Every structure is written in C-alpha cells, then in structure tokens.
C-alpha cells in the first residue's frame, strides 16, 4: 500500500506539472481543466476535473475506488494550494458487478460555490446532479471553434445541457441562439449561464422540448446547427 500511495502521489504531481506547462493552471481567465485522464496520466480508471478550487473525481475501477481517500489526500498535497475541496462522484461509473455501495459526496472540504471560468466565460457547474463531473470539460476546443463560426448566424444548440456552446456562440456574435434540451433542469442551467455572461440579452432563447422536433419546425431559419 505504501508503494501504491507513493505512485499515486508521484503521478498526480506529474499531472499538475503537465497542466501547468500547458498554461491551464493559475490563470485569471480559466480555472476549468481536466487534471487526470485515465491511462493518459498513467492512472487508469480515474478521471479528475478541476473547477476553481474544487476537484471532482470519478472512479471507473474498483482499484481507484478503494484508493479514493489516498487520492484525495495526494491531490490536495500535489496541488500546492490550488485544490481545497475534493468531491467524489462515482455512483454511476463504478462497475455494477462489483456491488459497491458508495454515495457521492465530499471527501475533503465542502464548498458548493459552483461558478467557474473557461476562456473568460463564467459557468454554473452542477457537480452534485449534473452529467459526468458537471461539465463537458473535454469540449473546450469545440466550444471555441463554434464561437469562431458563429458571427452573424442563427445558431441551434441541440441537447444543450449546460448551454456552454450557446454562451460561446453569443460571444462570437451570433444573431440568434436557440438552446434545446428535453430536460427542464438542463434548460434552467442553460438560461442561468446565458444570463450570467450576457444579462438581459434577448438573442438567446431556450426550450425544454424534443430537439429533433424543434429542428423539424425551425425550417430554414438556421445557419449553424450544433448536435
């Protein structure tokens, strides 16, 4: 176990060094990033996303679940003050055949302040009830790409979830942005994120309904569709 603890600490430290070299940490305009991506960081079965001073951890293997307390301690130590809270969210990611009972919850800290920043845009992150770790962190470059193409266009963001693509489209100069998701909770979150960044901006409309039915009814008014 001692050897395993040292290995985890070393690899988390390596993960922080790499993200620092990539200029993902200690930025005023960005505090959302993926710290650990499984095998890519030599920690198979583990995903850790960072939102400000909170790290959200998902175990996809029994081994990582068993080591969760060690990982939480090592994470805070390796972060050198960047991380204060560790939220464990593995109820739906652990192998069901392992018959492990583990409720989601904080392993360290207890901060529910959930506004984080990506490329200068603010987002409410719902790591308690949201999908994945609360935000699709791996879509950062795609969101920026949509922003690049959005100027002067009528945009439809299908299955919008948090509305991340919608907010980027608004900053990119879209004429109109429609956000559609069958989940009323997702639409509530999307509206909150749009209002957080562009208060009172009537270019954004959000709809809690079937995205494909909305697409059929939208006709030819759309010039950019994100699925």
What are the functions of these language-model segments?
Residues 1-7, 227:
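Short, small-residue-biased leader/transition segments that mark boundaries at the very start
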Residues 4-5, 56-65:
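Short histidine-centered catalytic/ligand-binding loop motif
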Residues 8-38:
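Conserved short alpha-helical segments that host acidic/polar catalytic motifs at enzyme active sites
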Residues 15, 74-78, 193:
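Conserved short hydrophobic interaction patches
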Residues 27-29, 81-82, 199-202:
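Short helix-terminating capping/connector loops at secondary-structure junctions
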Residues 36-49, 65-136:
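Non-catalytic substrate-recognition/targeting regions of SAM-dependent transferases
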Residues 53:
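Divalent cation-coordinating acidic motifs and surrounding scaffolds
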Residues 108-225:
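Rossmann-like S-adenosyl-L-methionine
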């Amino acid at each position: 176990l001692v050897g395993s603890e040292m290995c985890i600490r070393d690899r988390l430290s390596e993960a922080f060094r790499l993200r620092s070299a990539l200029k993902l940490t200690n930025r005023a305009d960005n505090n959302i990033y993926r710290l650990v991506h499984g095998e890519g960081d030599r920690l198979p079965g583990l995903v850790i996303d960072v939102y400000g001073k909170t790290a959200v951890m998902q175990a996809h293997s029994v081994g990582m679940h068993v080591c969760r307390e060690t990982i939480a301690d090592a994470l805070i130590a390796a972060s050198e003050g960047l991380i204060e809270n560790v939220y464990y969210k593995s109820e739906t990611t652990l192998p069901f055949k392992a018959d492990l009972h583990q409720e989601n919850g904080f392993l360290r800290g207890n901060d529910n302040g959930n506004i984080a920043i990506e490329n200068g845009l603010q987002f409410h992150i719902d790591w308690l009830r949201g999908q994945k770790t609360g935000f699709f962190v791996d879509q950062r470059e795609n969101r920026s790409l949509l922003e690049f193409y959005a100027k002067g266009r009528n945009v439809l963001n299908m299955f919008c979830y948090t509305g991340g693509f919608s907010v980027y489209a608004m900053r990119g100069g879209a004429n109109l942005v429609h956000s559609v998701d069958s989940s009323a909770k997702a639409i509530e979150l999307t509206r909150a994120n749009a209002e957080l960044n562009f208060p009172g901006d009537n270019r954004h409309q959000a709809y809690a309904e079937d995205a494909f039915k909305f697409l059929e009814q939208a006709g030819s008014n759309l010039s950019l569709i994100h699925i």
